[in-house]
Amino acid sequence: MQRRQLEERQRKAEIEAQKDAILRTILTPEARQRLTNVKLVRPELAEAIENQLIALAQSGRIQAQITDDELKQILAQLNSQTRKDYKITIKERGWK
């Protein structure tokens, strides 16, 4: 049981190391820092961006490093697609 958990942790660590190495080559240091900040606030959004960037890099569609400004544009596009609008309606008030 513990051996399986240890192997699982090691496998996840290896995958994260590979992802980090790829992101290091395709992102400028400023863009990497921004992605790290996003990961702290919205981990699911950062994960989606990381996976998308890695897929683009592996398919050869990224020719130069992605700058901070380009990452901002990507974040804005994904944020507008995944943004949820909340509407609060008050049915009854406690005072008259």
UniProtKB/Swiss-Prot annotation:
It comes from the Archaea. One of its GO terms (molecular function) is DNA binding. InterPro entries: DNA_bind_arc, PDCD5-like, PDCD5-like_sf. Keywords: DNA-binding. GO terms for cellular component: cytosol. This is DNA-binding protein Saci_1468. It comes from Sulfolobus acidocaldarius (strain ATCC 33909 / DSM 639 / JCM 8929 / NBRC 15157 / NCIMB 11770). Pfam families: dsDNA_bind (PF01984). Belongs to the PDCD5 family. SUPFAM superfamilies: Double-stranded DNA-binding domain.
